[in-house]
Amino acid sequence: MRSLAIALAATTVAASGALAQQQGVTKDEIVIGTIQDLSGPIAAFGKQTRGGMVLRVDEINEQGGINGRKIKLLVEDAAYDPKRAVLAAQKLVNQDKIFMMLAHIGTAPNLAAMPVQFEKNIVNFMPVTAAREMYEPFHRLKYSFAVPYYDQMRVMLPRLVKEKSAKKVCTIYQDDEFGLEVMRGAEAGLKTLNMELAEKTTYKRGATDFSSQVARMKAGNCDLVVLGTIIRETIGTIGESRKTGFNPTFLGSSATYTDLIHKLGGPAMNGLYASMGTQHPYLDEASQPIRFWANKYKTKFNEDPTVFSAYGYVIVDAFARAATKAGATLTTDSFIKAMDTMVIPTDMFGSAEATYGPKKRLGSDSSRLSQIQDGKWKVISDYATP
């Protein structure tokens, strides 16, 4: 009996020791971190992502937390700057001792911060960027939710080409890794139709004049234009086109799927298509659950939610599902084990079902199409996969 008691005591000590060694987890708290842009070029997106995260964290804590533990969310501002992202990651990982990094925004900041996290066995959970590097090459500490720009175009462009009977497909894209991913996806999609891009035009990040690119595409008789653009360049390109009487079909990636396009660009933006998954939460949305959620968000933060608010919300929700499934002894290993058989069902925003596995780190590769109609984004297609 005595030896059994000693063995049990040793087991208890070992178990509590393992728990004590797990950074960011105590008996009544889980500390998570996020790096956002709160003062840089995409600060609007960063603030909205943070808002969605805060809303879901507060709801979970009000309901008693995760297996009895409350969530503590720490937010750092890196202003969309990779150098600042490294410093923010070092602070969160080494000083604040977070358990996990969630919803870090932007491709370059994530690429800069991940080595800091991985050195300390900290998962990079569902960053807010659609870059393939968020799940490739495989790493056990990477989890991604955003369908890559490449796959979005590869799937959606052929559908639209057929629907519009387009003969000449052209592109304007940002002269960097983001723009190239959109362009390469367009090329891959056209290849399935035995077509090629008839005209390729580029612009440097920060450009404000797109007249020469539009003139070139107009002269080339392009009837469908793929936009490797974000906000200002999308509005600038379409605005210039309308002004010159050039009215092709415009298709953007999920980077153009934001209410800022129609809010800032006005009626000229009507007709724009974008690939997307998670639906923009309008306050007067026909869907009652989205409408209720959007008004709850507005009441809490005194501003309208956006699709980025929805991203923040669903990412924290997915984390909570996996952490709950991991059980009372929450460690990086138990979390990964829970994710290995994880199925995240579709949500009120219509996001595609996501599945993860031992070697599967992208939840879903399905996209659908939305179009700006009467000054609002409207979902117009079902999901499609590569």
Which positions does each model-derived feature cover?
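Extracellular/periplasmic periplasmic-binding protein-like sensory domains
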Residues: 238-313, 325, 379-385
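Short, low-complexity disordered leader/linker segments with a strong preference
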Residues: 1-31, 384-386
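Beta-alpha junction/loop-to-helix N-cap segments that form part of ligand/metal-binding clefts
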Residues: 29-31, 44-51, 59, 63-135, ...
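Extracytoplasmic "Venus flytrap"
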Residues: 24-54, 76-83, 105-108, 172-181, ...
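Segments of small-molecule ligand-sensing domains
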Residues: 299-309, 320-377
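Immediate post-signal peptide segment of exported/extracytoplasmic ligand-binding proteins
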Residues: 19-34, 62-71, 161-167
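Sec-exported extracytoplasmic/periplasmic mature domains
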Residues: 54, 58-65, 90-98, 114-122, ...
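Extracytoplasmic ligand/sensor domains, especially the bilobed periplasmic-binding protein
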Residues: 83, 97-200, 249-274, 355
